[in-house]
Swiss-Prot record:
It comes from Escherichia coli. Coiled coil: none annotated. This is Protein-lysine myristoyltransferase HlyC. Monomer. It is an enzyme of class 2 (transferase). The gene is hlyC. The keyword rRNA-binding does not apply. GO terms for cellular component: cytoplasm.
Amino acid sequence: MNINKPLEILGHVSWLWASSPLHRNWPVSLFAINVLPAIRANQYVLLTRDNYPVAYCSWANLSLENEIKYLNDVTSLVAEDWTSGDRKWFIDWIAPFGDNGALYKYMRKKFPDELFLAIRVDPKTHVGKVSEFHGGKIDKHLANKIFKQYHHELITEVKNKTDFQFFINRLRGN
């Protein structure tokens, strides 16, 4: 459910950030970078139960160029980047009260024909990896084929970047 009051949304999302073991120690500057553009672009979902927030997800629709920028530095996105293309990236996925499954089902239903990528961070090692997600109506084999093309386009572009820091083998699943 999207709530139409931006300050109320910010309060709900900040509550979820503070309740998340991964997010609670992140600086306020990351909250501003990750949350404000999502609310402005209406690229978020906030699940509530009994008027209390239980899960939040935001996504950016990136161009290939901004996707590379994001992979190189996850704090680099500016407001305009969030609506720069058609390559969907989950920016935040927060479900600190056990509602991860509900959020997953909601997103697969909301975006039945869409593909998403995400950087998932291991809470113990703080190492990130790129993960793939697809809507509920997309055939898994077709999704894999499209993701393979996405990765090919990405790797081709990254090879031309001399200042890129992300480890390419992670994109290939090695």
